[in-house]
Amino acid sequence: MKNPFEAMKQLKKLQEKMAKIEEELEQTLVEGTAGGGVVKIIMNAKEEIKEVKIDPEVVNKDEVDILEDLIAAALRDALTKAKEKSAEKMGSLADGLPLPPGLF
């Protein structure tokens, strides 16, 4: 049987690494855009929206539905990028630890 103290040390390392990754995810910003950049959504890799920017030139009360579509598209783009960054950071979580393959 493996030394339980060694396993506890490895668990502590994993927890420390996880805390560091969580902090990095909070600081990592991604930008989703739509309509050639007229709508931008900035969020962190924890999927928390930080900013929404809309070019005033596209604000037209007769075309609100187009603006709504652009906002939704920019949000989807930002979410995709945030999830990619998160997966990238989480993939490094188990580096150097003797864990079963595919666990993270």
From Swiss-Prot:
Major subcellular site: cytoplasm
> Which GO terms label this protein's molecular function in UniProt?
DNA binding
Asked if the keyword Disulfide bond belongs to this entry, the reply reads no
Listed under GO cellular component are: bacterial nucleoid; cytosol
Matches recorded under Pfam families: YbaB_DNA_bd
> Which residues lie within the region annotated Disordered?
85-104
Question: Do you know which InterPro entries this protein is assigned to?
Answer: YbaB-like_sf, YbaB/EbfC
* SUPFAM superfamilies for the chain: YbaB-like
Q: Which UniProt keywords apply?
A: Cytoplasm, DNA-binding
Q: In its keyword annotation, does this UniProt entry include Secreted?
A: no
Function description:
Binds to DNA and alters its conformation. May be involved in regulation of gene expression, nucleoid organization and DNA protection.
Q: What does the similarity note say?
A: Belongs to the YbaB/EbfC family.
Q: What is this protein called?
A: Nucleoid-associated protein DICTH_1981
